[in-house]
């Protein structure tokens, strides 16, 4: 694999107030894309407030590529219906990793960085990047776009496999 910086584990926690696409409910699943990579969760039957609690792991070679989240309603006899989408960038998350590597020894629960919800991102509320149980994690609620309603809750975690984000590594442009 070309210059892999590390792995990004996305914990797809849940969908909240998802759109109805069948008669009274939906059978939602999530597709996650980054560059040419495409992963998906399992389908949850008849549920608009879905608890996936599923881990999907992406290889990060180009940290400037956005992560795209797409939610669909599974249909058995026709094309699956779109239930919204969202995009986020991992630059702030990777910058928080660099900060933690420089500071080291952070107390449990330390907030390393906050990202405000704005028109330039799909966050529905402030997202904090924190030091938790010896790892850097970011919890986020993404407001689904191109749909009447719905949010997806995710947690990001970095798995360093190359040392590319440590103090000793050469600068990697973000």
Curated annotation (Swiss-Prot):
Entry keyword set: Abscisic acid signaling pathway, Acetylation, Calcium, Cell membrane, GTPase activation, Lipid-binding, Membrane, Metal-binding, Nucleus
Cell location: Cell membrane; Nucleus
Binding annotation for Ca(2+) 1: 21-22, 73, 75, 81
UniProt-listed GO biological process terms: abscisic acid-activated signaling pathway; positive regulation of abscisic acid-activated signaling pathway; positive regulation of GTPase activity
GO cellular component: nucleus; plasma membrane
Pfam family, one: C2
Quaternary organization: Binds to PYR/PYL/RCAR abscisic acid intracellular receptors in an ABA-independent manner, both at the plasma membrane and in the nucleus.
Role of this protein: Stimulates the GTPase/ATPase activities of Obg-like ATPases. Mediates the transient calcium-dependent interaction of PYR/PYL/RCAR abscisic acid (ABA) receptors with the plasma membrane and thus regulates ABA sensitivity.
Molecular-function annotations in GO: GTPase activator activity; metal ion binding; phospholipid binding
Gene this protein is translated from: CAR2
Entry similarity comment: Belongs to the plant CAR protein family.
Predominant subcellular localization, coarse grouping: membrane
Record protein name field: Protein C2-DOMAIN ABA-RELATED 2
SMART domains recorded: C2
Record flagged with keyword Transit peptide: no
Binding-site list for Ca(2+) 2: 22, 27, 73-75
Classification via InterPro entries: C2_dom, C2_domain_sf, CAR1-11
Cofactor field: Ca(2+)
C2 domain boundaries: 1-104
Modified residues (N-acetylmethionine): 1
């Amino acid at each position: 694999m070309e210059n892999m910086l590390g792995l990004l584990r996305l914990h797809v926690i849940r969908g909240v107030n998802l759109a109805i696409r069948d008669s009274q409910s939906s059978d939602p699943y999530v597709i996650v894309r980054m560059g040419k990579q495409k992963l998906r969760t399992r389908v949850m039957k008849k549920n608009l407030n879905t608890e996936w609690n599923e881990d999907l792991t992406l290889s990060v070679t180009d940290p400037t590529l956005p992560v795209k989240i797409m939610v669909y309603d599974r249909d058995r006899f026709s094309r699956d219906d779109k239930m919204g989408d969202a995009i986020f960038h991992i630059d702030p998350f990777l910058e928080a990793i660099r900060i933690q590597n420089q500071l080291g020894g952070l107390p449990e629960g330390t907030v390393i960085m906050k990202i405000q919800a704005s028109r330039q991102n799909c966050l529905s509320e402030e997202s904090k990047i924190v030091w938790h149980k010896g790892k850097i994690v970011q919890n986020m609620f993404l407001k689904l776009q191109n749909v009447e309603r719905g949010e997806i809750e995710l947690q990001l975690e970095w798995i360093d496999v190359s040392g590319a984000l440590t103090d000793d590594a050469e600068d990697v442009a973000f």
